[in-house]
Amino acid sequence: MKKTELLNSEISEVVARLGHKDLLVIADSGLPIPDNVKRIDIALTKGIPSFRDTLNTVLTELGVEKAYVAREMIDKNKKLYLELSEQFGDKLVIIDHEQLKEMCKNAKAVIRTGEYTPYANIVLESGVEF
């Protein structure tokens, strides 16, 4: 059995296959996911699993160079925005929500959580750990 926190085999496989600059999205329950992008749907019900729990677990295995969130999060989900700002520092990049949705088209996968708060989406750009 794995010793790390991330137990979901689909997510773990995607993370293991990411190369430098590849994109992985962690999404709330409402973000549209392009048909051509791998969907890993772990949503059970409203709020379960949460965006934060999912993100923090994925980050136990993923090195991140940049993290992109929608500008709309600043006003519509300020608490989450402040938490992510503290967590990612200057790696956090603010873009428009429409740009974020466009980036999803190039993602290796989108992880759909049960998160039920507005604009709780992040595009993670894989970094290099050496």
UniProtKB/Swiss-Prot annotation:
GO terms for biological process: D-ribose catabolic process. Keywords: Carbohydrate metabolism, Cytoplasm, Isomerase. GO terms for molecular function: D-ribose pyranase activity; intramolecular lyase activity; monosaccharide binding. GO terms for cellular component: cytosol. Pfam families: RbsD_FucU. Its EC number is 5.4.99.62. It catalyses: beta-D-ribopyranose = beta-D-ribofuranose. The keyword Isomerase applies. InterPro entries: D-ribose_pyranase, RbsD-like_sf, RbsD_FucU. The keyword Isomerase applies. Its main location: cytoplasm. The active site is at H20 (proton donor). Substrate binds at D28, H97, Y119, A120, N121. It is found in: Cytoplasm. Belongs to the RbsD / FucU family. RbsD subfamily. Homodecamer. Catalyzes the interconversion of beta-pyran and beta-furan forms of D-ribose. This is D-ribose pyranase. It comes from Caldanaerobacter subterraneus subsp. tengcongensis (strain DSM 15242 / JCM 11007 / NBRC 100824 / MB4). The lineage of its organism: Bacteria, Bacillati, Bacillota, Clostridia, Thermoanaerobacterales. The gene is rbsD.
